[in-house]
Amino acid sequence: MKKNLLPLLALTALAAAQPARAQAVFPPSEPPSVYGPYVGAAFGTAQARRGCPVAIQGGGRVCDDRDPSWGLFAGYQLNRYFAAEVGYRDLGFVRATAPTSSLTIHSSAWSLVAVGLVPVTERFSGFAKFGGYRVLLESSQGDVADAHATGLTYALGAQFDTGGRFGVRAEWQRYRKVDGGAFYGVNDYDTLGVALLFRLR
């Protein structure tokens, strides 16, 4: 009886293992509705990595190079691995303050990037962005003209898709070597935060 039972148990275990093996594929099966257009909003912090420009330092001023940041973006996901995205980001203020005076610089950026995604599970992906930016720099000094700068931007993050139309991101992005000329100087701006994504179909 035992000799007859052992082959039967072995066959049963082998049959049960086949569906599990078939499910363990890479990349994972895709969540529904991941293709097509999407829009989103981002919230977090921005930091001018090189501090305050020389033009607004001195005179006993203290530099505050970090500020709340928000952004809006729209994109189109071509397939599970690639998307294209345009975005606007308010990079906040850099402030140099003293007991009797203060100077501020406000920065905002438009960007156009390619997005590469790496699926980890059915709903969770890592991603990277690479593209270009155009930054507007504005001073609180009325006699100083605004400045524009263009350059490269890149980002790393993770995305979770709910399975419906919504997704959530955590993301770090750098706007590299923002060159505003003699007054504004050169700075790197980093943003760190979360974003909510809504798929339009």
Which residues make up each language-model segment?
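Bacterial N-terminal signal peptides that target proteins for export
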Residues: 1-7
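Gram-negative outer-membrane beta-barrel domains
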Residues: 18-201
